[in-house]
Amino acid sequence: VKSLSSLRISGAEVLPIVEGGKGISVSNGESSGAWAAAGGVGTFSGVNADSYDENGNIIPQIYYGKTRRQRHEELIAYAIRGGISQARIAHDMAGGRGRLHMNVLWEMAATEQILHGILEGAKGLIHGVTCGAGMPYRIAEISAHYGLYYYPIVSSARAFSALWKRAYQKFSDLLGGVVYE
């Protein structure tokens, strides 16, 4: 078996093995922490991530608001708490090895607010943000605000060209890579 050579990803030498960041709690702090602990890049989903109580039990996402707006605000709070929770779990499991990324969907509701909330609450725990599902123009600016690398997911060279011209060229030093799907 031939050994893998490391690559510089999100500011560190790691194995070129990257967890994809599957959504809705499939890729979580445990899976991403394990990938990072093995020397690769772990990616947890920041979409509706689970949060836990003091006993380690999942906190059910129950909405008590009487209006759509109130329930939306509850959803945002759950998303931020869950993302921070998964980042902490991943960071603890990684033990300082590898890199940790968060994956979000640009077109989900309140993406920017949720991103800021998670990244503010998980400072120093996350090294990069992967983002697709739309044209994530502001992912570069938001990631740069927190000193993080960003990895847009694009569907074509034309889409990337538009993103580059409109936003990414201003933050090219933190563009960690581009995911094509």
Predicted regions and their residues:
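Active-site entrance/lid segments in N-terminal catalytic domains of soluble metabolic enzymes
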Residues: 1-181
